[in-house]
Amino acid sequence: MKNRRLCVFISFVLCCISVLAYSEGSHNNSVNKKTSEKSKKPTLMILPSDHWCEQRFYMTTWDNQGVKVKSPDYQTAFLQDRELTQVISNLGQLLTIQGYTLKDAEQETKAIFKRIAEDNVTMSATSGSVIAESPLDMIKKAAKMDILIQIDWNINSDRSVTFTLEAFDSYTSKRIATATGTGKPSNQILPVMLEQAIKSKIKDFDKQINQYYADCNKHGREIILTVKCWANWDGNLEMENEEGDELIDVIKKWLHKNAVNGAFNLSDATENFALFEQVRIPLFDEEGYAIDARDFATLLRKYIKKECDLTSKVMTRGLGEAIIVIGEK
């Protein structure tokens, strides 16, 4: 009898230990996942600066709804400048050592420029209304990098090289880090000269990026959200629901609940247009997947459909700007 009671007691203890171990393991997995997300470094892409492209005549034009706009021709630059690929590769190695993941700029630009002629506008399936995107906007959206690194350099008369390194948030185009310097005179090839000159500045450059990204983790990433009405729709943002709330108020309430810390700024508004700037969105969703402006705007589009029974279309310009146009697809 005593042996039986002892066996039951031991079984109970082992069961409790198993439950506690499973619970602790699940908790640790959850903590590790959150820690991993917070410690994850942003994804980078390196491109030559606009000034570098302009000085070497690597420029192209694109049609922004009837207006010709100049933009760097990255595809031609990669094809014709023999040193560019090696410069970017060497800089990429320095940044990889700092823990960053890099997107292949040359391959991404090849893929994008193949379809620029047909994809440089997004339009309404109903009325044919359009929104234009620059080649760089398209590269950002396709590559989905967090940070764009641009490099510029000049070889001096004494065979030293002066460089400028800048980092831009791909979502807002804000400059978030910069480094400049001049290397020692050298007879090395340009890519090696640049690498040696940049090495002494890379730690501080990395620190600036980390500080910015830590702020994004804490306070959310900025995007721009525009709400418009199709011209052939008979409603507007001042139309009221059954509770007497205008459509613009319904949208603002949703943003207060879904933006990080309810942070956004209604910069401009009319009955047919609303511009929300400094909208803070989380870097990742609950599953750990990265969120961009389209993802966030799509959630709002679904909410407008559910609450107001209104059809709308989400369009984007790059990663950090979304436009919701209400009234049709």
List each language-model region with its residue ranges.
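Amphipathic beta-strand/beta-sheet edge segments enriched in Tyr/Trp
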Residues: 143-187, 317-329
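Bacterial Sec-dependent N-terminal signal peptides
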Residues: 1-27
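Solvent-exposed coil/turn segments that connect beta secondary-structure elements
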Residues: 49-52, 107-108, 170-171, 228-232, ...
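Extracytoplasmic
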Residues: 39-41, 82, 86, 90, ...
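A cross-taxonomic marker for long C-terminal extensions/tails that follow the last structured domain
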Residues: 296-329
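N-terminal segment of the mature soluble domain
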Residues: 58-133, 141, 245-284, 288-305
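C-terminal/domain-edge helix-coil "capping" segments
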Residues: 24-57, 175-263, 317-318
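Short, flexible helix-coil linker/hinge segments at the edges of structured domains or between repeats
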Residues: 107-126, 168-189
